From Swiss-Prot:
InterPro entries: DUF4693. This is Tubulin epsilon and delta complex protein 2. It comes from Homo sapiens (Human). Residues 327-339 have a biased composition (Pro residues). GO terms for cellular component: centriole; cilium; cytoplasm. Residues 45-69, 95-169, 326-345 are annotated as: Disordered.
Length: 433
């Protein structure tokens, strides 16, 4: 049995490792969802509104129950529909025969316009197209253009302008369904939008205006550089140097930015310089001057050290400004995210994903798998270090005798050397009699 303090510490470490694994799993699932959404077909935002209108078959339920027509209205609507169908048949027969005059047509149109609340049934003979209606029914406040009814197809009432087109319009292939086909033809369903994939049509995406402007400037500058004749003359070399300086000035400012590696190297040099300055200052302060000349030399040395310290502080401020301009970098595995030596020791709560450069999807898959494998190995190494710090003192403090000590050694060897996967088995041979 392990001591209580050791057990609590080990349980806390294991719980922290499990929490880190769960958080890593959530991050991987989120990244996987984003990748799948990018690799699937993209639906353009402009085509979402272009949906076909619901037809007579799909419009089974009325979205406005308060506007449901009464049976009397439905009956009057049926009479009007029959009258319009008869008028269409009469018009088709008159057009085929060629016996229609324009004056009766205008007269019938004026009759239809003046009697806005009545509907006429056409005469029985084609020659009497301009006659009065034989059967009229009042329309009691019918205001809906389209009225769905059970057992009847959806029909649309014609306004005064539509009635004029019935009197003067072109032919229709069918008397009943022709009107509905003509009215539904303009609102036909558009074709389905073509699938947009990032692999095939990613080059069609447009960058923001600032990026496009910078890219055009960069391409024009490189075009000028490539057009410059390559020669060994000093004028051409000076012109190229001046041109590259102009490119750096136009792209990133008067001075090039320091990279993260350069910042780390410079910070290391500053640390070494600070340690040397500290040692030199201790030596000067600990030495007791024998005369005024030694004291004067000591003061001069301290003034020089103070000037060097000021230069180091100024350089440190420049490095901090360079780090502040750079985007945040991902924290290495095994290092607490609260402080990073590459960032000057400042705390950064959120880390951006690491930028991967790859040439194929297989290479990207290999990079991701190796990155996960390295993270797992780092976690295992950290846990083994914790186990070594907790278990080795117990083994060294125990008395090397008896089965309990052997069992403890086997358990420690299994945890530290085998990763807990295998346990050694000790065989004892009985002495021969």
């Amino acid at each position: 049995m392990l001591p209580a303090g050791c057990s609590r510490r080990l349980v806390a470490e294991l719980q922290g490792a499990l929490d880190a694994c769960a958080q890593r799993q959530l991050q991987l699932e989120q990244s996987l969802r984003v990748c799948r959404r990018l690799l699937h077909a993209w639906e353009p935002t402009g085509t979402r509104a272009l949906k076909p209108p619901p037809g007579p078959e799909t419009n089974g339920e009325d979205p406005l129950p308060a506007c449901t027509p009464s049976p009397q209205d439905l009956k009057e609507l049926e009479f009007l529909t029959q009258a319009l169908e008869k008028a269409v048949r009469v018009r088709r027969g008159i057009t085929k025969a060629g016996e229609r005059d324009k004056a009766p047509s205008l007269k019938s149109r004026s009759i239809v316009t003046s009697s806005g609340t009545t509907a006429s049934a056409p005469p029985h003979s084609p020659g009497q197209a301009g006659g009065h209606a034989s059967d009229t029914r009042p329309t009691k406040g019918l205001r809906q253009t389209t009225v769905p009814a059970k057992g009847h197809p959806e029909r649309r009432l014609l306004s005064v302008g539509d009635g004029t087109r019935v009197g003067m319009g072109a032919r229709t292939p069918r008397p009943g369904a022709g009107l509905r086909d003509q009215q539904m033809a303009p609102s036909a369903a558009p074709q389905a939008p073509e699938a947009f994939t990032l692999k095939e049509k990613g080059h069609l995406l447009r960058l923001p205006a600032a990026f496009r402007k910078a890219a055009s400037q960069n391409s024009s500058l490189w075009a000028q550089l490539s057009s410059t004749q390559t020669s060994d003359s000093t004028d051409a070399a000076a012109a190229k140097t001046q041109f590259l300086q102009n490119m750096q000035t136009a792209s990133g400012g008067p001075q090039p930015r320091l990279s993260a590696v350069e910042v780390e190297a410079e910070a290391g040099r500053l640390r070494k310089a600070c340690s040397l300055l500290r040692l030199r200052m201790r030596e000067e302060l600990s030495a007791a001057p024998m005369d005024w000349m030694q004291e004067y030399r000591c003061l001069l040395t301290l003034e020089g050290l103070q000037a060097m310290v000021g230069q180091c502080l100024h350089r440190l401020q420049e490095l901090r400004a360079a780090v502040a301009e750079q985007p945040p970098r991902p924290c290495p595995v095994g290092r607490p995210p609260g402080a990073s030596p590459s960032c000057g020791g400042r705390a950064e709560p959120a880390w951006s994903p690491q930028l991967l450069v790859y040439s194929s999807t297989q290479e990207l898959q290999t990079l991701a798998a190796l990155k996960l494998r390295v993270a797992v190995l780092d976690q295992q190494i950290h846990l083994e270090k914790v186990l070594m710090a907790e278990l080795l003192p117990l083994v060294s403090a125990a008395q090397p005798q008896g089965p309990p000590w052997l069992a403890l050694c086997r358990a420690v060897h299994s945890l530290l050397c085998e990763g807990g996967a295998r346990v050694l088995t000790i065989l004892r041979d009985e002495p021969a009699v």
